[in-house]
């Protein structure tokens, strides 16, 4: 009991003395190197490994354009690497194309008042919660449910932090309480903690949730290594620490001469004034900005040219379609006109054929009535001779009438067929013209939509 009280007092004293990483901080960027994706700003009390995000203020709103991790602190200047902001990645939302620039604000420790706590048993869990009243500890039940029976990995812990807006993770290892940044997994603070009295541990850590099973395949891949609590979490923290040391050494291999030259250029606030009032040579930061802007302009130019080519192709296709439509209409009009003329000529021929039989009948009748009848002087023999002549004339009149009737019926049938074909042709021509007009209208609408 005495040991527990001493531990509580020690933890309370340490928590009161080291709370700088909990207070939110906002700093302004003083230097940007776009090719290397490095920014510099006043360090204040920032530590290596702390995570933040860059905010750019526009006309009437602000936008988060990138996230940063501090890689070095020297002479009151913090150096950080920045990358695309992916903590709230959502493929259905627009992706910002802006990058960090001088004058933007970097926000740190915005979520450091919320934390996950990984402890081996309920005693240490409640002890740490009681001695850190200024921290809002998210229930470990949520974290163990999120892991779904698998061993805690750094990638999974980062995802859980993003889901629940958590900034730090408290992990109990052998005789140590480690406070790590969620995003960089860098150790922000270490506190001594007596764990010699721990005889029984929970898997993967203490929580009130039981019965979560990853299944046979899940156990095969996860390995259930967290059953040995202290061995697993000691190795997890040391592994990440070795990784961060390697990253730090790799970042320190950046050309020191170039860094010193850049710092000197930034230290000179007032540019040298030329005698003739000429403009000064651009600084390294301005060159980097100009280079990045040229890249963006080149991309925009390529995109603009690609869109223009597409529009030109669409316009050319529309013009070709209109020309083909005009040619087709002209050809249809010529064919229709030819059919109409042929039909009119057929009608004229039939009228002439109808007039000729009538004229023939009149001529026959007139010839028959040329010789006057001499009733008083005509003999019976003359009457007998005239009778067969009249019968023959009637037969001749009947014969031409029957032939003309047949011819007339044939001509009427031909005329009916020609009229029917002409009507069918006109109907097909109208349908074809309507269909072409609809297609042309659809092409024009598509072209207008493409131009917009």
Swiss-Prot record:
<dbReference type="GO" id="GO:0009986">
    <property type="term" value="C:cell surface"/>
</dbReference>
<feature type="compositionally biased region" description="Basic and acidic residues">
    <location>
        <begin position="317"/>
        <end position="373"/>
    </location>
</feature>
<dbReference type="InterPro" id="IPR032737">
    <property type="entry name" value="PGBA_C"/>
</dbReference>
<feature type="compositionally biased region" description="Basic and acidic residues">
    <location>
        <begin position="392"/>
        <end position="452"/>
    </location>
</feature>
<comment type="function">
    <text>Binds plasminogen, specifically, and in a concentration and lysine-dependent manner. Plasminogen is the precursor of plasmin, a serine protease that cleaves fibrin, fibronectin, laminin and vitronectin. Acquisition of plasminogen/plasmin could enable H.pylori to degrade host components.</text>
</comment>
<feature type="compositionally biased region" description="Polar residues">
    <location>
        <begin position="374"/>
        <end position="391"/>
    </location>
</feature>
<protein>
    <recommendedName>
        <fullName>Plasminogen-binding protein PgbA</fullName>
    </recommendedName>
</protein>
<dbReference type="InterPro" id="IPR029276">
    <property type="entry name" value="PgbA_N"/>
</dbReference>
<dbReference type="Pfam" id="PF15437">
    <property type="entry name" value="PGBA_C"/>
</dbReference>
<dbReference type="Pfam" id="PF15436">
    <property type="entry name" value="PGBA_N"/>
</dbReference>
<feature type="region of interest" description="Disordered">
    <location>
        <begin position="265"/>
        <end position="452"/>
    </location>
</feature>
<feature type="compositionally biased region" description="Basic and acidic residues">
    <location>
        <begin position="284"/>
        <end position="310"/>
    </location>
</feature>
């Amino acid at each position: 009991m005495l040991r527990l009280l001493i531990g509580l007092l020690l933890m309370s004293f340490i928590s009161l003395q080291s709370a700088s990483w909990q207070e939110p901080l906002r700093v302004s960027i003083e230097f940007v190197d776009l090719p290397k994706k490095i920014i510099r700003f006043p360090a204040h009390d920032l530590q290596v490994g702390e995570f933040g995000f860059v905010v750019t203020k526009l006309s009437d709103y602000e936008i988060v354009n990138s996230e940063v991790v501090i890689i070095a602190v020297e002479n009151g200047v913090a150096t950080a690497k920045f990358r695309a902001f992916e903590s709230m990645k959502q493929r259905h939302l627009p992706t910002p194309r802006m990058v960090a620039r001088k004058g933007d604000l970097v926000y740190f420790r915005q979520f450091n008042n919320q934390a996950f706590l990984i402890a081996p048993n309920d005693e240490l869990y409640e002890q740490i919660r009681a001695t850190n009243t200024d921290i809002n500890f998210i229930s470990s039940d949520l974290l163990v449910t999120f892991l779904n029976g698998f061993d805690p990995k750094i990638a999974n812990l980062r995802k859980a932090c993003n889901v629940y807006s958590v900034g730090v993770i408290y992990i109990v290892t052998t005789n140590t309480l480690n406070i790590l940044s969620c995003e960089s997994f860098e150790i922000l603070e270490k506190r001594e903690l007596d764990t010699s009295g721990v005889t029984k541990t929970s898997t993967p850590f203490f929580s009130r949730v039981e019965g979560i099973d990853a299944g046979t395949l899940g156990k095969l891949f996860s390995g259930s290594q967290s059953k040995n609590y202290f061995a697993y979490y000691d190795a997890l923290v040391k592994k990440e620490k070795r990784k961060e040391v390697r990253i730090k050494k790799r970042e320190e291999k950046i050309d020191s001469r170039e860094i010193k030259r850049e710092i000197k250029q930034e230290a000179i606030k007032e540019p040298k004034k030329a005698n003739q009032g000429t403009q000064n040579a651009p600084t390294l930061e301005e060159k980097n900005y100009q280079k990045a802007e040229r890249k963006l302009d080149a991309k925009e130019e390529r995109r603009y040219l690609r869109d223009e080519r597409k529009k030109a192709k669409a316009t050319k296709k529309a013009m070709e379609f209109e020309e083909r439509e005009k040619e087709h209409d002209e050809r249809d009009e010529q064919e229709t006109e030819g059919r109409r003329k042929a039909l009119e000529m057929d009608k004229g021929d039939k009228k002439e054929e109808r007039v000729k039989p009538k004229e023939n009948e009149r001529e026959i009748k007139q010839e028959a009535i040329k010789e006057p009848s001499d009733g008083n002087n005509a003999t019976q023999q003359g009457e007998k001779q005239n009778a067969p002549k009249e019968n023959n004339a009637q037969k001749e009149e009947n014969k031409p009438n029957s032939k003309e009737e047949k011819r007339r019926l044939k001509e009427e049938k031909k005329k009916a067929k020609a009229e029917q074909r002409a009507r069918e042709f006109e109907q097909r021509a109208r349908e074809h013209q309507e269909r072409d007009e609809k297609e042309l209208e659809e092409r024009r609408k598509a072209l207008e939509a493409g131009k917009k």
